[in-house]
Amino acid sequence: MFNKENRQKARVKRHLRVRNKISGTAARPRLAVYRSEKNIYAQIIDDVARITLVSASTLDKEFAEKVGSNKEAAKAVGTMVAKRALEKGIEEVVFDRGGYVYHGRVKELADAAREAGLKF
């Protein structure tokens, strides 16, 4: 009943519902999170111009020693995406959890980004 395909479809439906309410602008871009089994990704996106301003993931060269998709890796990705955003002058974002429950790796990434200086 709740196999992987159905869970994925439900997540995509949740994400579409969230995306109808959330949109990133140049003043307040969107911090989008994607979680896979082996990695975690974060992007800061300007939806009006349709460009990715900043991105970070566990596949980056800086995370060679923190390979994986655990909470520690999510925390490192959150810190890195916030650091890169602040370097580009982005201080305030809208958080897009990507249809995932705000718990575990997604929450760790968000908390680390907040601690590093992003406001949302």
UniProtKB/Swiss-Prot annotation:
Q: Which InterPro entries match?
A: Ribosomal_uL18_bac-type, Ribosomal_uL18_bac/euk
Q: At the top level of its lineage, which domain of life is listed?
A: Bacteria
Question: Can you provide one Gene Ontology molecular function annotated for this UniProt record?
Answer: structural constituent of ribosome
What Gene3D superfamilies would the database entry show? 3.30.420.100
In the UniProt record, does the keyword RNA-binding occur? Answer: yes
CC terms in the record's Gene Ontology section: cytosolic large ribosomal subunit
Any GO BP annotation: translation
Regarding protein family, the annotation reads: Belongs to the universal ribosomal protein uL18 family.
Q: What is the protein's quaternary organization?
A: Part of the 50S ribosomal subunit; part of the 5S rRNA/L5/L18/L25 subcomplex. Contacts the 5S and 23S rRNAs.
Q: What does this protein do?
A: This is one of the proteins that bind and probably mediate the attachment of the 5S RNA into the large ribosomal subunit, where it forms part of the central protuberance.
Q: HAMAP family from the xrefs?
A: Ribosomal_uL18_B (MF_01337_B)
- For this entry, the protein name equals Large ribosomal subunit protein uL18
Originating species: Clostridium novyi (strain NT)
